[in-house]
Amino acid sequence: MTATAEKTAGRVVRITGPVVDVEFPRGSVPELFNALHAEISYKDLSKTLTLEVAQHLGDNLVRTISMQPTDGLVRGVEVTDTGTSISVPVGDGVKGHVFNALGDCLDEPGYGKDFEHWSIHRKPPAFADLEPRTEMLETGLKVVDLLTPYVRGGKIALFGGAGVGKTVLIQEMINRIARNFGGTSVFAGVGERTREGNDLWVELADANVLKDTALVFGQMDEPPGTRMRVALSALTMAEFFRDEQGQDVLLFIDNIFRFTQAGSEVSTLLGRMPSAVGYQPTLADEMGELQERITSTRGKSITSMQAVYVPADDYTDPAPATTFAHLDATTELSRAVFSKGIFPAVDPLASSSTILDPAVVGDEHYRVAQEVIRILQRYKDLQDIIAILGIDELAEEDKQLVQRARRIERFLSQNMMAAEQFTGQPGSTVPLKETIEAFDKLTKGDFDHLPEQAFFLIGGLDDLAKKAESLGAKL
């Protein structure tokens, strides 16, 4: 407990949108990140406003960021220093409920007030306590398991521009992994649509997974302070399950870009000089503070899946570029693949994984994956020639390769559980062994006699046989 932990009162002296300057008595200035409370009474409105100390301005003044709209707040209002930072409830009781960034329960107001609370500002685990993981997390999605295998206890990101399927794929992973995981899941909705949060709540309840999932939301209608802190609030809940209960935890974050965007808004409001492309000068530091806490320690882990919006499909933008350095696997969603009607719209040549290595996944898996990548890369290299001269001008070997590449592209598509209500087709799950076997046969030419359409939006070999038969061909 610090010297400023005793509750002291100050006064609001300046309000600029979500930025509030507060003056405290000499010697009682609150520390950075302390939470302050201000009581607002305006007409029929009565509420407690939470402010977080962001800067010390000198002369007993602090600059704070409000976590709620400042409507009704006026100069002279008394502000109380709580002596601690923002904290959220932790423990088994948070499962099955929705919280905001401040730890207030949204589906059952007042719930969780008497729970143990942890500060959202925490240090990452010590380096000596970290435990590298190389175990593969099987998803049942062919394109992911074959070409960008996910690491259990690792950090995984889904990159993509607007409208290419990031949120759908995140929901698909929740359906596939959380159902079979058996552990605890935490979902952070950072600056995304409220409708999507409601849809997720309903889907989790229908799938009987809600009882093992905690949800924390700070959606796009919230002030930037809330959107900047909600990921830390969700992560704190996940850390409790990892550190105190020794559980393997799944952490879903949608969307990391909104976390960066909120930080940029706050930085501008605080008057900091902008850095590249207008982002905050502290971008790398803020991203590191979040990502370094998402890690595996001895015998327990947090496996995170993060959606990352790519502004204007520009992967050199500082927001997605800063995220890359922290990841174990990247799945890049492509507008070009999306335009072909191939879902999930994963770009197999741009996606990567640190465990696509024969020492981890085995020689057979690695060999088949590399052959698939080789064929797709050669097909990409031939695109310009095909566009100018036509496919008939290619050598026979290249013609055959192009036909196989087109079959591979379509076979990488798959019906998803999260899209069942829209497509009317049940989602399919393909075991890794079957995926490797099927693509091995495909790259060797065993399926050259089948029409391309037979490979489109199906699961494994059984689905391929049925689809081929319906098109008048035999496997």
Curated annotation (Swiss-Prot):
InterPro entries listed in its UniProt record: AAA+_ATPase, ATP-synt_VA_C, ATP_synth_F1_bsu, ATPase_a/bsu_AS, ATPase_alpha/beta_chains, ATPase_F1/V1/A1_a/bsu_N, ATPase_F1/V1/A1_a/bsu_N_sf, ATPase_F1/V1/A1_a/bsu_nucl-bd
Catalytically driven reaction(s): ATP + H2O + 4 H(+)(in) = ADP + phosphate + 5 H(+)(out)
Compartments in which it is found: Cell membrane
GO molecular function: ATP binding; ATP hydrolysis activity; proton-transporting ATP synthase activity, rotational mechanism
Keyword rRNA-binding attributed: no
Record's GO cellular component terms: plasma membrane; proton-transporting ATP synthase complex
CDD domains (UniProt xref): ATP-synt_F1_beta_C, ATP-synt_F1_beta_N, F1-ATPase_beta_CD
UniProt xrefs under Pfam families: ATP-synt_ab, ATP-synt_ab_N, ATP-synt_VA_C
Binding site residues for ATP: 160-167
Annotated membrane topology: Peripheral membrane protein
Quaternary assembly: F-type ATPases have 2 components, CF(1) - the catalytic core - and CF(0) - the membrane proton channel. CF(1) has five subunits: alpha(3), beta(3), gamma(1), delta(1), epsilon(1). CF(0) has three main subunits: a(1), b(2) and c(9-12). The alpha and beta chains form an alternating ring which encloses part of the gamma chain. CF(1) is attached to CF(0) by a central stalk formed by the gamma and epsilon chains, while a peripheral stalk is formed by the delta and b chains.
Function: Produces ATP from ADP in the presence of a proton gradient across the membrane. The catalytic sites are hosted primarily by the beta subunits.
Name this protein carries in UniProt: ATP synthase subunit beta
Species for this entry: Mycolicibacterium vanbaalenii (strain DSM 7251 / JCM 13017 / BCRC 16820 / KCTC 9966 / NRRL B-24157 / PYR-1) (Mycobacterium vanbaalenii)
Gene designation: atpD
